Amino acid sequence: MQNHHHQQSSYGGGYPGQAYREQHPPPNPYGYGQPSPQPGYGAPPPHNGYGQPPSGYGQPPPPTGNAVYGGRQPGMNQYQNTYSHGHQGGPPPPPTDPVAFGHGAPQGYSFQYSRCTGKRKALLIGINYFGQKGQLRGCINDVKNMSTYLNQNFGYAREDMVLLTDDQQNPMSQPTKANILRAMHWLVKDAQPNDSLFFHYSGHGGQTPDLDGDEEDGYDEVIYPVDFRQAGHIVDDEMHRIMVRPLRPGVRLTAIFDSCHSGSALDLPYIYSTQGILKEPNLAKEAGQGLLGVVSAYARGDMSGMVSTAVGFLKRATKGDEAYTRSKQTKTSPADVIMWSGSKDSQTSQDAQIGGQATGAMSWAFITALRKNPQQSYVQLLNSIRDELATKYSQKPQLSCSHPLDTNLLYVM
């Protein structure tokens, strides 16, 4: 079991997170001792969790048209300016119209970038595994740093963030498997085009033999809830099914994984590094297998098309067509899903231990790079993150995406 994990090295005085905590003492009104207030977590939640949380959790902004964050955020104007900055010689903002997948996909098969001007919600999970073998040190700090950064710099309100950490008294705020899955559903529920959702996981990651044949290396990536010994792990396929598949065109989900073997933790098909594109799907082949029809019917809201395609799936699958049974559905999405992670899937658990891949490296480098220059393109940010990581770690950053990404566009969130 433990050979799937890295052991976190003692950070001593060198923990990189200290650097940005010292530069910007976060004015956290709740203090780091207590959890931030989380409506819907106090009492056992009604309607199986996040259905109808109390006030402030999911209220639409007032119908003024210009109050981007429901009028709550004093820093709103400064953040909205991203777009005007983008034209002054900086990277261009994302296009507002749908973009074709191209690369052999059927005509009309498209996705949409999010302008990230809508509602914002964040789910941050940090697990130190207190009292368990393989206890980690910095994971809870990672997500507290990230929540402060999102709140101060990107207009994420505290009441629209859920933090699951294993130092909290409230059982609903413990990062158990049930709580994590429930929170993932809450995160994506009712998301609209141009919303910006954020997911951060800091804890143990590992690999398990891939049962559905969709991973090239024969392993699925997994994350380990605090109660994994009783409840089991959570596989990348399940995270994709809950957090990626339901998203409509134009919804952004940004994910950051601070864990070993997180390179494909959301099962996204396009992977970019500082060197350019590392991996892209064979869409012509997927189209030939009928895999792309389901997504585009879903994106159009054409449920009748979806049902008939799905029935076609079943018929062919029962004939034993291996490709159909294997890659149940394409991993592309009409939404705008991106994921930042360190290193590569191919890194073995032994390499991870020898390389001392430290939990927290990715989120620390992400925050540090954006603090130094908030106006970067995707490829500039990849390079900035690589430069930050190179000062302390051997791992390289990679950016995975649900669609082909124009890496020269302005990075927005």
UniProtKB/Swiss-Prot annotation:
Coiled-coil zones: none
Keywords: Apoptosis, Hydrolase, Protease, Thiol protease, Zymogen
Signal peptide: none
Biased segments, Polar residues type: 75-85
Biased composition (Pro residues): 36-47
GO biological process: apoptotic process; proteolysis
InterPro entries, per the entry: Caspase-like_dom_sf (IPR029030), Metacaspase (IPR050452), Pept_C14_caspase (IPR011600)
Keyword match Hydrolase: yes
Domain of life of the source: Eukaryota
EC number: 3.4.22.-
Region listing for Disordered, in residue ranges: 1-104
GO CC list: cytoplasm
Biased composition (Low complexity): 49-58
Active site, per annotation: 204, 260
A GO molecular-function annotation: cysteine-type endopeptidase activity
Similarity comment: Belongs to the peptidase C14B family.
Role description: Involved in cell death (apoptosis). Required for the apoptotic-like loss of membrane phospholipid asymmetry at stationary phase and facilitates growth under conditions of endoplasmic reticulum stress.
Name this polypeptide is given: Metacaspase-1A
Gene: casA
